Amino acid sequence: YLDGKSELAIRGCLCARYPRESFQLADKLSAGFFKTREEVLPFFEEQLRCTGAGYFDYYLIHAMSAERYDFYREVGAFDIIPQLKREGRVRHFGMSFHDKAEVLDRILTEHPELEFVQLQFNYLDYEDPVVESRKCYEVCVKHGKKVSVMEPVKGGALAELPADAGAILDALGGGSHASYALRFAESFDNVFMVLSGMSTLEQMRDNLATMSDFR
């Protein structure tokens, strides 16, 4: 992101200031930044250099779909990342996923080395026929994979509900609208991480309060 400056920012704000074992860091292998197998490892090494992290706790094949599956196999992603894990430069190997549940089932069947899947998962998309949040989650459970959640608040849409829907949650007196969305995602057994985009300090504090006293 930001022409690579996001990784430099992480280096200055996080990796250069705090002990490495005090935080967890993820990065991703993104199609569009390389075309051949020979370019994958240099791309990864540049990410490590820019962040100064030494290793990534979570390294993901980014935005996996049926369309991109063949490409990632052709460039050796499923060979190179496990080798990086054996070398200790990656701790956990997974992918973010954007496609149908049947595609996910095929990929996890063919690549059991994947440890986790990042899914778009929220109560609005749970039964959505395009996103298939529930079905994709159930595929992960079937294969014994942990799930990290993206879009738990659906780009902020579930943080500011329409008046009628918001009134129902407000009457419960259980916190912000966003907190209900986070708690929905976190309540599933195979979910081990919930990622929420935050643009203000207030949003960050609300999310931290929700997850620190989860109920």
PLM region spans:
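Conserved, mostly hydrophobic/aromatic
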Residues: 10, 25, 47, 56, ...
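Structured C-terminal cap/extension of enzyme domains
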Residues: 12-14, 83, 135-215
